[in-house]
C-alpha cells in the first residue's frame, strides 16, 4: 500500500531479500543453483526486464545463476514454486528456487496495458470480472452472507494475531531491511487483532 512500510523499496530489492536470507540461514555456494523462478503479474517498469534475474544479481548470487519470470496472474508465485520443483522432479535440475514478487504500490495492476482487462471484446470471451465483483458473485451463489463472512474474517484476524504472538511464523518470515540495513518490516502489518465483525 502507498503508505505501507515497504513503499520506499524497489520491487527488485524486495525480490532479492528472500534470496539473500536463504543464504544467510543456510550458507551455500550460489553457483550450485540451477535456476531461480519468480512469478510476477505486471512485469513492466520497475518489475520489468526479468525481475527474477535482477533479484539474483541484487542478492549477490554468482552472475552465472540463471533465472526466469513467469506470469499466471494471481497464481504466479505459486506457479513459480511448482515450476521450480517440477524441474527437480523431472531431473532437469538439482537445486532450484521458486518465489514471486508484486509491488502494486509502485507498479499498479493494469500498468502493463494488457488487453484482457481493458478490451471489452476480448474480456467477453472469458467473462472477465475484477476480484471484488467475482468474490461477491461467488458468495451469493454459494449462500455466504455478509454477516457470516465478516464473522469469519474477524475470527481469522484474531487467530493470525495469536499465531504471530506465539512465534509460529518465525521460520517463514524474513525481516525486510533497506540497503543501509534499517529494518522496515518484521511482521505482517495487515493483521488487525482488534478488528470485529461490526468494524469490517
Feature locations, PLM:
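Short glycine-/acidic-enriched loop or helix-start segments at secondary-structure transitions
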Residues: 47-48, 106-109, 180
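Conserved active-site "lid/cap" helical segment
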Residues: 1-41, 45-55, 59, 66, ...
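Conserved catalytic cysteine-centered active-site region
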Residues: 9, 37-93, 125-133, 194-199
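Active-site-proximal alpha-helical scaffold in enzymes
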Residues: 72-101, 139-169
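Flexible glycine-/small-residue-enriched beta->alpha junction loops
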Residues: 89-142
Amino acid at each position: 500500500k502507498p503508505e505501507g512500510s515497504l513503499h520506499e523499496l524497489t520491487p527488485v530489492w524486495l525480490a532479492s531479500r528472500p534470496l539473500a536470507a536463504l543464504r544467510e540461514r543456510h550458507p551455500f555456494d550460489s553457483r550450485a543453483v540451477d535456476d531461480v523462478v519468480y512469478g510476477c503479474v505486471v512485469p513492466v517498469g520497475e518489475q520489468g526486464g526479468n525481475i527474477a534475474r535482477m533479484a539474483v544479481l541484487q542478492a549477490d548470487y554468482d552472475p552465472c545463476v540463471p533465472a526466469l519470470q513467469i506470469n499466471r496472474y494471481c497464481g504466479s508465485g505459486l506457479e513459480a514454486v511448482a515450476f521450480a520443483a517440477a524441474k527437480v522432479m523431472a531431473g532437469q535440475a538439482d537445486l532450484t528456487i521458486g518465489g514471486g514478487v508484486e509491488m502494486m504500490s509502485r507498479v499498479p495492476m493494469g500498468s502493463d496495458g494488457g488487453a484482457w482487462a481493458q478490451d471489452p471484446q476480448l474480456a467477453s470471451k472469458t467473462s472477465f470480472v475484477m476480484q471484488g465483483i467475482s468474490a461477491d458473485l461467488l458468495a451469493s451463489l454459494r449462500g455466504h452472507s455478509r454477516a457470516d463472512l465478516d464473522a469469519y474474517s474477524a475470527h481469522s484476524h484474531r487467530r493470525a494475531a495469536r499465531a504471530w504472538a506465539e512465534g509460529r511464523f518465525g521460520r517463514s518470515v524474513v525481516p525486510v531491511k533497506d540497503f543501509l540495513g534499517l529494518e522496515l518490516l518484521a511482521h505482517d502489518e495487515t493483521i488487525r487483532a482488534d478488528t470485529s465483525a461490526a468494524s469490517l
